[in-house]
Amino acid sequence: MADITIAGVMRAGAYSPNHIGNDTAIFNLVAEQLRKRGCQVNVYSEEQFNKQEIEEPVVLAMCRERASIAKLQKLEDEGKLVINSGYGIENCTRERMTRILLGNGIPYPESLIVNTNENIKSQLKKAGFKSCWIKRGDFHAMHKEDVSYVRHPEEAQEVLQEYFYRGITRAVINVHLVGDLVKFYGVKDSQFFYWFYPFDEGHSKYGWEEVNGHSQGIDIDLKELKDICTRAAE
């Protein structure tokens, strides 16, 4: 790996809610390990990345701003190796991800995709939704208010209207599923796959894990979980 020059792009703090320290530590540790292997890692903030010409042949990115993602895609189209792909990051925005997963038969909560200026009460009642989650659909969540738990259609309508007033035009509504909440990290085509109960570990972005509460230890078929995650990554 010697003589490889890498542009390392950090994540703006606005996209690391309650995890700025964690995300910075991950980035720094990865850069440190690459340097130990002989790579030169040039570090850019998102602002620097968007303003400067990137000459490095490899880009290691944790960025999330719209302009950053567009630039990652441009660099990838020009032939640079970009990790993670700007196209993959864009596919993880809520509405796009929901359409991709449902369209490919990946297990996913029943969902509605709506404009935030719609009257949704009748849609929710027809779909049988009571408790559900409203999430901004246009981009990555930046604030606690970008993800909302509601207990009935009337409350959902009020929250959706608040999204509209904040300039968010699209939202995804997921039915609430009762059960253990699991978080996982994995790398496709590798042995790395790690899962845990975020509420039990005190790992949280917005505190919404408390809705499901402490885990009950429901049996998990880890092979099936990993297989589902692999299919989703594809």
Regions found by a protein language model. Name each.
Residues 1-2, 43:
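Short N-terminal or domain-adjacent regulatory/targeting segments
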Residues 2, 7-12, 77-79, 87-174, ...:
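Active-site nucleotide/adenylate-binding loops and adjacent lid/helix of ATP-dependent enzymes
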Residues 10-115, 119:
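Conserved N-proximal alpha/beta basic substrate-recognition cap immediately N-terminal to
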Residues 30-33, 219, 234:
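C-terminal active-site "lid" helix and adjoining low-complexity regulatory extension at the edge
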Residues 35, 102, 125, 230, ...:
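Short polybasic/polar patches that bind polyanions
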Residues 68-69, 141-143, 181-183, 194:
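Short catalytic/ligand-binding loop motif for oxyanion handling, primarily in non-cytosolic enzymes
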Residues 149-232:
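Phosphate-binding site of ATP-dependent enzymes
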